[in-house]
UniProtKB/Swiss-Prot annotation:
Molecular function GO terms recorded: ATP binding; GTP binding
Sections of the chain in a coiled coil: none
Protein name: Nucleotide-binding protein ROP_69550
Organism of origin: Rhodococcus opacus (strain B4)
Superkingdom per UniProt: Bacteria
Signal peptide location: none
One Pfam family linked to the record: RapZ-like_N
Keywords (A to Z) from UniProt: ATP-binding, GTP-binding, Nucleotide-binding
Amino acid sequence: MNEQHAQSDRPPTVRPMDFLLVTGLSGAGLQTAAKVLEDLGWYVADNLPPELISRMVDLSLESDSRLERLAVVIDVRSRLFTGDLGWVLTELESKPVHTRVLYLDASDEVLVRRFEQVRRSHPLSGGGAEGTLSEGIAAERDQLAKVKAAADLVIDTSSLAAHQLRQKIEDAFGDAENRTMQVTVQSFGFKYGLPMDADLVCDVRFLPNPHWIPELRPHTGQSADVRDYVLSQDGAEDYLATYHHLLDLTITGYRREGKRYMTIAVGCTGGKHRSVAMSEALAGRLGKDSGLNVRVVHRDLGRE
């Protein structure tokens, strides 16, 4: 008993804040990495001077709304960045943070092509004079050699598309919750207009309308009687199965391209009976996929 009491009086263990330093070669995908980390729930500070990193970590730890994950993107755009971050990492060792370094790399050939495609000069190319792009890349690569050697993870983006880089970053710095896809199944009535935010729209007006059955008319598609009536109609279950298969293919493709949010609109005439029942049934099928976070919204329910 005394031992249990002593344990309960101990202060709760505070989980160290995750701190990620993101750096690498210009044109290797630093901005893409920043956007992915933001989508994963990281607080991202872009191009922060190295001298301010330690102070920002302190402020993040002292804040009432303490950050759990902080990422700082730093590159040669900062005039104070000499490529030596050893002293910054040493300062962070005394703080309750779990520090990692991500370095993005790419081949000279790919970097030259990327800069030429966007028609921008390299930050170290001396103003973009002709013949200095390769020199700028070489100078930056030499300047960042120590950082690359100290990195916890080096990703070469030479042969990676944006969605492939996203996947690598998600695998390394995401968690199970943030890797799930957010799917909204929204019922609606066509007479009130199409949902503006829908990625896909399906029309279930081919099913008999419960509105014309007096005992069902007052109820909605959420009631057992209306639901059973709608789902028992010829073609209803086949339609759900076929559309679910189509969504499986679509969701797989969306995931591959890095899309993390999706809205599926299911419409009938007034958004009260058929679309509500079919939305609930479709969401139930989608909800069996552990990689999806599914919610149902009935946009026009109660408008009549």
